[in-house]
């Protein structure tokens, strides 16, 4: 591996080892990094970092693509069922890979339940292969999920209950789900960055969940004086998640807290935390709200190609259903 990296200008065996230790295992990781990220590694100057990045981009053939090439790339997108046919219809078939989907809502609106359900659905072959088109089957072999829990709400027993409701083995779902408990934003960001290490180690990560995205940032950066710092850090975190989705054709799901809008006279009286940073970085954005009994309403209000729409689903002992 070190021998491969030495093909880059200014990278000798010693620098190659430092890059590998820092998690830069291939040209693509270097090509999609910033100069600032590489200069954090001891012994790498800004000039050297710039040369490495440009050379890596040439080797990876990064640059402009025609619309036809992008259309072909879109054919590798696959979709995963949410468990609700009505919600899947709003999403034109299910949760989409190569994208970040946000579910925001008040407590009890069903955010964490959807996250648990997707871990189960990932292990159901008929769900995965429902809309594969150009995806190679080997790419989807033994798919695994990563669940970064920032609020202590992941419940393995609930996953088992949902799996049994779906007719599959709960232990299999848990065996294929990596869980990390993040107590602060630094841990949360580190776990997200370490996902590439899991992939390089031979784990076929196809689902990444952050539950919830903004709680640690919200707790640490209080007051308007720290808002800019919080947003910059949150922006870097979202960039990491988008990169994972694009490079590894995986689905990224994030839940988000909401804040009241006291000046709202009509429409939704809450807004998702994170402002424009999250709004621009998320591909699909949902608001969840409670309805009668076990019913919940999911409203899609932002998407690059789908219309605004709503779906009603239920949270039962067996999981997410219509």
Curated annotation (Swiss-Prot):
GO terms for biological process: DNA recombination; DNA repair. Pfam families: HHH_5 (PF14520), Rad51 (PF08423). Gene3D superfamilies: 5' to 3' exonuclease, C-terminal subdomain, P-loop containing nucleotide triphosphate hydrolases. InterPro entries: AAA+_ATPase, DNA_recomb/repair_Rad51_C, DNA_recomb/repair_RadA, DNA_recomb/repair_RecA-like, DNA_repair_Rad51/TF_NusA_a-hlx, Hlx-hairpin-Hlx_DNA-bd_motif, P-loop_NTPase, RecA_ATP-bd. ATP binds at residues 105-112. It comes from the Archaea. One of its GO terms (molecular function) is damaged DNA binding. Keywords: ATP-binding, DNA damage, DNA recombination, DNA-binding, Nucleotide-binding. The keyword Chaperone does not apply. Involved in DNA repair and in homologous recombination. Binds and assemble on single-stranded DNA to form a nucleoprotein filament. Hydrolyzes ATP in a ssDNA-dependent manner and promotes DNA strand exchange between homologous DNA molecules. Belongs to the eukaryotic RecA-like protein family. NCBIfam families: PRK04301.1 (NF003301), recomb_radA (TIGR02236). This is DNA repair and recombination protein RadA. It comes from Methanococcus maripaludis (strain C5 / ATCC BAA-1333).
């Amino acid at each position: 591996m070190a021998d491969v990296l030495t093909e880059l200008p200014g990278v000798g065996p010693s620098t190659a080892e430092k890059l590998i230790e820092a998690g830069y295992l291939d040209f693509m990781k270097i090509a999609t990094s910033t100069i600032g990220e590489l200069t954090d590694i001891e012994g790498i100057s800004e000039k050297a970092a710039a040369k490495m990045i440009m050379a890596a981009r040439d080797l990876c053939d990064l640059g402009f693509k025609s619309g036809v090439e992008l259309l072909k790339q879109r054919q590798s997108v696959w979709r995963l069922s949410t468990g609700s046919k009505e919600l899947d219809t709003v999403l034109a078939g299910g949760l989409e890979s190569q994208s970040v989907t946000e579910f925001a809502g008040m407590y009890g609106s069903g955010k964490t339940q959807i996250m648990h359900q997707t871990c189960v659905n990932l292990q159901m072959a008929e769900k995965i292969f429902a809309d594969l088109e150009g995806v190679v089957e080997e790419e989807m072999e033994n798919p695994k999920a990563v669940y970064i829990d920032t609020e202590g709400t992941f419940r393995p027993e609930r996953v088992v209950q949902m799996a049994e409701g779906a007719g599959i083995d709960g232990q299999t779902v848990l065996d294929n789900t990596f869980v990390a408990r993040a107590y602060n934003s630094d841990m949360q960001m580190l776990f997200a960055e370490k996902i590439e290490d899991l992939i390089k180690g031979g784990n076929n990560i196809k689902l990444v969940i952050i539950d919830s995205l903004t709680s640690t940032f919200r707790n640490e950066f209080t007051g308007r004086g720290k808002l800019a710092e919080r947003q910059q850090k949150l922006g870097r975190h979202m960039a990491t998640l988008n990169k994972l989705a694009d490079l590894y054709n995986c689905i990224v799901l994030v839940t988000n807290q909401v804040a009241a809008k006291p000046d709202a006279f009509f429409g939704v009286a809450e807004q998702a935390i994170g402002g424009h940073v999250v709004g621009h970085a998320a591909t699909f954005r949902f608001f969840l709200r409670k309805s009668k009994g076990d019913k919940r309403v999911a409203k899609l209000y932002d998407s690059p190609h789908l219309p605004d729409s709503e779906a009603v689903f239920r949270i039962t002992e067996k999981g997410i259903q219509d």
